[in-house]
């Protein structure tokens, strides 16, 4: 009996250690995956920032608004998967130069799928905007379209995808 109990105890310990190792490997791989992303080109952002006069407002830690005067059109942008949101800053400033209020949202771990509802509440902050558009690059575009389909709001979708 004692031998049987020892074998059973060893088997349980081996099983538990195996599960812990598998969880650790999966967690480590996930951490490496989400921390390996495309970063913004700081030279492009600096160059564009010096030649741009659009008012920039930070709504919260994750949301930047590029607000031209007297804008009547707004554009909420979801960044592509594993792309640093500031990489889209020159694009947002260029659109704002054309009179469009642009909202750029940083996604958790640079994955829009983790916060599909990031646009929620933004549009109500700007009642002067008559037409709203929502879109994004790649995974961000897909999540913007998913958000729109669930909200059934009077928005237009600009969904950009690259593969």
Whereabouts are the PLM-identified features?
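N-terminal Sec-pathway targeting helices
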Residues: 2-24
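N-terminal cap/lid segment of alpha/beta-hydrolase-fold proteins
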Residues: 27-73
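Short beta-strand element of the alpha/beta-hydrolase
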Residues: 72-80
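The serine-hydrolase catalytic nucleophile loop
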Residues: 81-91, 107
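Conserved alpha/beta-hydrolase
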Residues: 92-112
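Active-site nucleophile loop of the alpha/beta-hydrolase fold
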Residues: 107-108, 159-163
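Gly/Ala-rich beta-loop-alpha elbow adjacent to hydrolase catalytic centers
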Residues: 135-144
């Amino acid at each position: 009996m004692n031998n049987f109990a020892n074998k059973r105890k060893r088997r349980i310990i081996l099983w538990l250690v195996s599960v812990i190792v598998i969880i650790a490997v999966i967690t480590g791989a996930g951490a490496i995956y989400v921390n390996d992303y495309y970063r913004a080109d700081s030279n492009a952002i600096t160059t564009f920032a010096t030649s741009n006069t659009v008012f920039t407002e930070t709504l919260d830690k994750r949301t930047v608004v590029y607000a031209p005067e007297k804008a009547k059109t707004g554009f909420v942008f979801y960044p592509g998967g594993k792309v640093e949101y500031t990489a889209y800053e020159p694009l947002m400033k260029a659109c704002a130069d054309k009179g469009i209020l642009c909202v750029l949202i940083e996604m958790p771990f640079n994955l829009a799928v983790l916060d599909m509802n990031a646009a929620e509440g933004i549009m109500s902050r700007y009642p002067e905007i008559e037409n709203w558009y929502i879109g994004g690059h790649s995974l961000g575009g897909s999540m913007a379209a998913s958000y729109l389909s669930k909200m059934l709001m009077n928005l237009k979708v600009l969904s950009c995808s690259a593969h």
